[in-house]
Amino acid sequence: VADALTRADALCAARGTRLTALRRQVLELVWTGHRPRGAYAILDDLSQAGGRAAAPLTVYRALEFLVAQGLVHRIESLNAYIGCPAPGRTHTGQFMVCEGCGNAQEIDDPQVTAALAACATEHGFRVSRQTVEIGGLCPHCQETHPDPEPVS
């Protein structure tokens, strides 16, 4: 968590953007627990931490800023956010999302990116953003859950 905050401070300073106290606190909460966090869970944690009470819109604006800066990613299928381990480096969002525990892991596979770009080009489609979410079971949940339905 400390490394993520240090990288965020440096990245925002280099870009001339402000990592306000609230944005920093939201980023810290996203990284705490190392699993995707929803906006309302973050809001609850902010309320429990004391200090000023934040409105949902304020938390969403902080999350939008963090996403725009590449400090966090939004996991669409979970409607939650996860810290980016490589902020400042251009990459696409590729995630393995566990359907058992809800954990998510970011991967950055250039072959996946290239294959999707080639497919888009073949169909005359211009890509503006790319997010891939692969649902399944993490190694821990595979031990306790039956096999998921295979994708054909």
Question: Residue ranges of each PLM-predicted region?
Answer:
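Pre-recognition alpha-helix immediately N-terminal to the DNA-recognition helix
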Residues: 24-29
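Non-DNA-binding regulatory cores of transcription-related proteins
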Residues: 67-152
